[in-house]
């Protein structure tokens, strides 16, 4: 993990973590929404 973060500033690392969390949340919400829509129309 340390090797990956070598040469990366704290701000860049924080931005990457926030972006990753946002993507994970978006994917999770999309899957949940798809199930709701499928059950509604099903």
Curated annotation (Swiss-Prot):
Its cellular-component GO annotations read:
helical viral capsid; host cell membrane; membrane
Q: What is this protein called?
A: Capsid protein G8P
Q: To which protein family does this belong?
A: Belongs to the inovirus capsid protein family.
Q: Where in the cell is it found?
A: Virion; Host membrane
Q: How does it assemble?
A: Homomultimerizes. There are several thousands of this protein in the phage capsid.
Q: Which residues lie on this side of the membrane: Periplasmic?
A: 1-12
- List keywords of the entry alphabetically: Capsid protein, Helical capsid protein, Host membrane, Membrane, Transmembrane, Transmembrane helix, Virion
Q: Does the keyword Metal-binding apply?
A: no
Topology: which residues are Cytoplasmic?
35-42
Q: Which organism is it from?
A: Xanthomonas phage phiLf
User: Which gene underlies this protein?
Assistant: VIII
């Amino acid at each position: 993990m340390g090797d990956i973060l070598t040469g990366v500033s704290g701000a860049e690392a924080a931005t990457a973590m926030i972006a990753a969390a946002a993507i994970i949340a978006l994917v999770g919400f999309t899957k949940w929404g798809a199930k709701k829509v499928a059950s509604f129309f099903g």
